[in-house]
Design a protein with these regions (language model features):
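Conserved N-terminal subdomain of the carbohydrate kinase-like
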Residues: 46-89
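Beta-barrel outer-membrane channel/assembly domains of diderm bacteria
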Residues: 12-14, 26, 35-43
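Short pre-catalytic strand/loop immediately N-terminal to key active-site residues, enriched for Gly-Thr
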Residues: 20-30
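Short, flexible micro-motifs
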Residues: 11, 33-34, 57, 88
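Secondary-structure boundary/capping motif
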Residues: 2-3, 38, 72-74
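Positively charged, low-complexity intrinsically disordered leader regions
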Residues: 1-19
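Short, glycine/charged-enriched secondary-structure capping and boundary segments
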Residues: 19-22, 63-65
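Short secondary-structure boundary/capping elements
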Residues: 2, 7, 28-35
């Protein structure tokens, strides 16, 4: 089995929800290195993601989502008092 480690930053993505008024957003997460890790895992590669996140609820949700996609999270560092990056589209 192919083993891959992807290193990078994943960020929270806010996107205005279609068909809604201003101020309503859907939340996701993404980034080129995470997307690569997810697609490699879907193809059957043993994939780990190496990054740093905070110790907040959003970071917890990110890790749960990655694990659900089959991406290894054992190498994710947790930084007390920090938050993940955020961007809007």
């Amino acid at each position: 089995m192919t083993r891959v480690a992807c290193i990078g930053e994943c960020m929270i993505e806010l996107k205005q929800a279609q068909g809604t008024g201003a101020g309503l957003f859907s939340r996701g997460y993404g980034g080129d290195t995470l997307n690569t890790a997810v697609y490699l895992a879907r193809l059957g590669a043993s994939t780990d993601y190496i990054t740093a996140l905070g110790d907040d609820t959003l970071s917890d949700e990110m890790i749960v989502g990655w694990a659900a996609e089959g991406v290894g999270t054992a190498r994710v560092s947790r930084l007390p008092g920090k938050l993940p990056g955020l961007y809007m589209i």
